[in-house]
From Swiss-Prot:
Pathways involved: Fermentation; pyruvate fermentation to lactate; (S)-lactate from pyruvate: step 1/1
GO biological process terms held by the UniProt record: glycolytic process; lactate metabolic process
Species for this entry: Ligilactobacillus salivarius (strain UCC118)
Principal place of residence: cytoplasm
Alphabetic keyword roster: Allosteric enzyme, Cytoplasm, NAD, Oxidoreductase, Phosphoprotein
Broadest EC class assigned to this enzyme: oxidoreductase
Name of the protein this chain belongs to: L-lactate dehydrogenase
GO terms assigned for molecular function: L-lactate dehydrogenase activity
Catalytic activity: (S)-lactate + NAD(+) = pyruvate + NADH + H(+)
Residue sites binding substrate per the record: Q86, R92, N124, P125, V126, D127, D152, T153, A154, R155, T233
Positions that bind NAD(+): V18, D39, R44, Y69, G83, A84, S105, A122, A123, N124, S147
Amino acid sequence: MSKTQNHQKVILVGDGAVGSSYAYAMALQGTAEEFGIVDVVKERTEGDALDLFDATGFTFPKKIYAAEYSDCKDADLVVITAGAPQKPGETRLDLVNKNLKILSSIVKPVVESGFDGIFLVAANPVDILTYATWKFSGFPKEKVIGSGTSLDTARLRVAMTEMTGIKDPRSMHAYIMGEHGDSEFAAYSAATIGGRPFLDWAKEHGVSKEDLDKMEDDVRNKAYEIINKKGATFYGVAAALARISKAILRDENAVLPVSAYMEGQYGLNDIFIGTPAVVNGTGLHEVIEVPLNEEESKKMTESAATLKKVLTDGLKALEENK
C-alpha cells in the first residue's frame, strides 16, 4: 500500500449516479480516511464533498474533498466510474466506443500523477474497460480489477433466497460468471447451500431446469428492468464497489467475483472476465478457477469470445480515430 495502514486514500473518478452512490457507501462503511472526487463538473464534486462531509457527523471521521488528478499521486486506490450511461434499449457492449475514449482521457493523467496503487474499474462495458485500463496504464495485471460479475452474483444469491426460503443471501454460495452483460451465466453446477450442492437441493424440492433457467435469465436482465423503470442502476453496484474496496484496503484476502485477467484459467488468455478471485492489499492475488460442467465451460468460452471481438474492434477504432 502506498500510505500507512492508519491513513488510506481513495480517489473516485466520475461523480455521476454510480460514483456518488459509491462515495456515500464508503462514507457509511468507514474505510479510507481520505476520499477525493474527480469529475469534469467541478462544482458537482464540491457540492457532493460538502454533503458527504456532513454525513461523517453520524458515521466515521473522513477527509472528503473535490480532487484533481494530481491528488492520485499518493492514493492507495483509484476507482473509475466515469463514462456514458447505459440508455434504455442499449446493451453494455454498445457503450464501448464512447467509453474507451473517455477512459483513455482518465487513465493517462492518473498514471502521470505518479499513482502506484490499485485501479478498480466499474464503468461499462466493465470487462473491456478493465482490460483497456490495464493496457493504457502499463500496470501489472494484479493491480487492475474490474467490478465484473459482483453485482450479478449478488442478484443471483438474492434470487436464490426467494426460491429456497433461506433469507440470508450470504448463505448462498453461487456465482454468475463470464461477461458482466448478456453472455453471463450462472455456474449452478458449483453452487452450494450449507455445503450441499444446490442442484441436489433443487431436484429434491421439485425445481425444474426451466425454473433455474428463468432465474438465471431474470438475473441477466434485471439491469434492463431497472433502467427501463428509473433510468439507471447505481445502488447495487455502489455497494459492490464498496465491498471490493474494503477487501483491498483492509487486506482481507477475500474471495469475490470480479473481472480478472486470464492466463490459462478456463482455457482463456489475454482477457479480463468475471470469475471468483482472491482480493487483498496487493490487488488481485489469485484467480479461483471454478470447476464448471461442459455446458458452463462452453458458455465461458463463448462469453470470452464475445468480449474479445468487441475489445479488438473497439481498440482498433480508438487507434484509428486518434
